Amino acid sequence: MRFPMHVTTDMMRWQIKNKIKGNKRFPVVLMLEPLYTCNLACLGCTPERHTGDIRNRLSLEQCIAALDESGAPVLSICGGEPTIYPELVPLVKAAVERKRHIYLCTNGILLDRFFEKAKPHPRLSINVHLDGMRDTHDFVCDRDGVFDKAVAMIRKGLSLGYHVCTNTTVFKETSVEEIEEMMQLLTSLGVKGMLISPGYHYEKLSTDHFMFRKEIHEKFTKILALAAKYPIYNTPLFLEFAAGRREYPCTPWGNVTRTPLGWKGPCYLIGEKYYPTWEEFWTSVDWDYWERREDERCQNCFMHSGFEPSVVRKLGESWGDMWTMAKWQFMS
């Protein structure tokens, strides 16, 4: 089974509940950035995400309120670096009590401190950032030794009984051969899930490491072939989309983002505006416009946070797609 059964059943119940209520749009994942403080300055990250003052972090109460307001069954704790957040352990506890499934996204540098304070739980996944093998990952993180630390923390997390997965961004220079080498390593360690995302131009960053549409299609055509050999978390229909074999509208409301600046609209990557309240965010963003991908910043986007929800949203339109997804979830 690709995901734990409770994740699948929670998602199904949430979708059925919203459809019964007649809700056309509803979030499935809360991307919670409790702080913009980080111990790295990775090349794919905008400055505001790693230069924030820890004193400007969200309070524990604000984080819990975001959980309750969005109602999303999945919580992704990102940032910034979440393991720096002083209230991380009680935040995870509060999310578990609300029967959310938590992905703790981390670079791994301070993960051993979290392990000392927390305990494994079926509703908690440790999601370690790994953008390739040693040379590539340390280059992306702009610091030597980060790869070795991440791998050590993956080993330790697994030995302690945590569910550990990884998150990888593919850049222009990244070879698919290296991605497969990384997958071989992670599989040998016992990692059960690997999320792969294309790095693309969405902001005016001083880097040319991001890919455009043609480059994304070429690399993800090869990554699609790897999905039969390794436990890739991306759905097969999303990988076909990233490979240029099918089209989807965006679903920016599927993964909503709460930050120290407010609710980020329209999506995780594009900060057109920050809203002080959930109600203002949910009712003010022009979802129709952003779904159509007409904005210039959306042209090269194949981000899983925008299009995995689209896969689910459009799934009922094809029996073949439903069968593909059923095999992927229950027979792999």
Question: Where are the regions that the model predicts?
Answer:
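Conserved alpha-helical substructure of the radical SAM core
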Residues: 2-117, 121-122, 328, 332
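Conserved residues at the C-terminal ends of beta-strands
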Residues: 48, 78, 129, 197, ...
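Flexible, active-site-proximal loop/turn residues at the rims of small-molecule/cofactor binding pockets
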Residues: 51, 81, 132, 200, ...
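Radical SAM enzyme [4Fe-4S]-AdoMet core and its adjacent flexible, acidic
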Residues: 58, 68, 98, 122, ...
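Generic structural signal for helix capping and beta-alpha/helix-loop junctions
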Residues: 52, 84, 112, 135, ...
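Short, acidic/turn-prone active-site loops that include or flank metal/cofactor-
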Residues: 34, 108-109, 130-134, 321
